[in-house]
């Protein structure tokens, strides 16, 4: 960085969003067309407890793709992750205390950005 600054270059440094360590499983049921992400689901036949998720029933209002007429999005928050009832205990043990992408968290919503300008 020192050599770059000596030449008068400005540096813009950024990175991808982060991950979230998950440790709380939430049961969700979806059909065969439901995506496999552990922190968000999109589908037309989702079954879940609406008090445990952030749900979006009108994706177009939020700029999200509308995969079919009745698409619903649900997002995990905090340290939650989604698990299906079949083999529930296996998946809970397998994914508990792992780092996952997706969902609603500071790590997922904020993208770090810094601009370094050399002193004159």
Q: What name fits each language-model region?
A:
Residues 1-120:
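Feature captures the catalytic ectodomains and active-site-proximal regions of enzymes
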């Amino acid at each position: 960085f020192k050599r770059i600054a000596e030449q008068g270059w400005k540096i813009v440094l950024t990175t991808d969003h982060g991950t979230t360590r998950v440790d709380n499983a939430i049961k969700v049921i979806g059909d065969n067309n439901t995506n496999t992400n552990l922190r968000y689901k999109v589908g037309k036949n989702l079954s879940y407890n609406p008090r445990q998720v952030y749900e979006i029933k009108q994706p177009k209002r939020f700029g999200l793709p509308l995969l079919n007429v009745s698409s619903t999005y649900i997002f995990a928050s905090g340290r939650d992750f989604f698990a299906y009832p079949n083999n529930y205990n296996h998946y809970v043990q397998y994914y508990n205390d792992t780092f996952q992408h997706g969902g609603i968290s500071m790590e997922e919503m904020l993208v770090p950005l810094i601009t370094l300008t050399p002193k004159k």
